[in-house]
């Protein structure tokens, strides 16, 4: 009998058991967009599948020039320059090779903000001379704790502030109130880690 993770096709449902990553690791092409359930008047197209040395992709963001930045699960960021109609990749380049599992990417305020889960921190990357290379990396906020439910997505608020979403593997920052139900304290007195937004 074939192993469950080798069974084609890779279709993910609402109640998937979180094993799709194992099944996806055996595929050579991304999921067929024809299998997606989309709202009316929306469409999905496959532009590119991950190449052999590009690993698994965990997040993406577009810069002001329409280039796509993709974070690899292990480490590093890849930038794809797309054709004018956005249907082909014209250029592929590594723009960072040391930040680990960047689950959150956000272009804002002339910089790329990166929530690097396995690097345990939020960073700002800047291109200070306009040559397309991030030549300045600044640690903005380090966080202790695990990585399973770790440092996740970033969002730009209507107030132009950047919000980082952290899961319950990450320790609460000092001075932050724990707003979980006081009833659960009877069974679990205090946890250093709790899901939060900073």
Summary of predicted features, one role per range:
Residues 1-198:
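Beta-propeller domains with acidic blade repeats across secreted/periplasmic ectodomains
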């Amino acid at each position: 009998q074939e192993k469950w993770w080798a069974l084609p096709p890779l279709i993910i449902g609402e109640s998937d058991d979180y094993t799709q990553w194992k099944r996806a690791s055996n595929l050579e092409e991304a999921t067929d967009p024809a299998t997606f359930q989309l709202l009316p008047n929306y469409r999905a197209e496959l532009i590119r599948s991950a190449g052999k040395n590009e690993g698994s992709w965990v997040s993406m963001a577009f810069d002001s020039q329409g280039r796509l930045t993709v974070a690899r699960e292990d480490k590093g960021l890849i930038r794809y320059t797309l054709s004018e109609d956005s249907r082909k990749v014209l250029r592929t380049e590594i723009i960072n090779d040391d930040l680990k599992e960047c689950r959150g990417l956000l272009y804002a305020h002339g910089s790329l903000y990166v929530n690097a889960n396995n690097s345990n921190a939020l960073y700002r990357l800047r291109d200070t001379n306009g040559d397309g290379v991030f030549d300045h990396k600044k640690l903005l906020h380090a966080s202790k704790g695990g990585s399973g439910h770790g440092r996740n997505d970033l969002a730009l608020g209507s107030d132009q502030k950047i919000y980082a979403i952290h899961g319950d593997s990450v320790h609460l920052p000092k001075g932050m109130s724990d707003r979980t139900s006081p009833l659960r304290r009877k069974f679990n007195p205090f946890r250093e880690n709790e899901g939060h937004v900073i």
